[in-house]
Amino acid sequence: MNNNTRVYRMSFAGVYPHYIAKAEKKGRTKAEADKIIYWLTGYDEKALQQVIDDKTDFENFFNQAPKMNPNVSKITGVICSYRVEEIEDPIMQKVRYLDKLIDELAKGKAMEKILRD
């Protein structure tokens, strides 16, 4: 099983608490992390909770996302040693987009800049 397949099969519910913890450890809030997820994927609070309750894997989390934000192409930079804009695998790129946005939140970047609207 290659690394991408391993990530695809990971439950979003298993990773979500780490996103929240990363934000909170740096003085940011769960609400801000959730807002980033809503912005990126189009999920709302109820739909996100359903994904968590169902233990949906990352592949389906992104494939079933209500509406990926049209401004995702504005997300650039390096995360986990990869330039997000150069990742060719569409699901892996979306995973890294989310990682990048949560990382920016934890680094203290203003929400207006993170959300790139």
Region locations from a protein language model:
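A charge-rich, low-complexity, intrinsically flexible signal that marks solvent-exposed coils, linkers
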Residues: 1-117
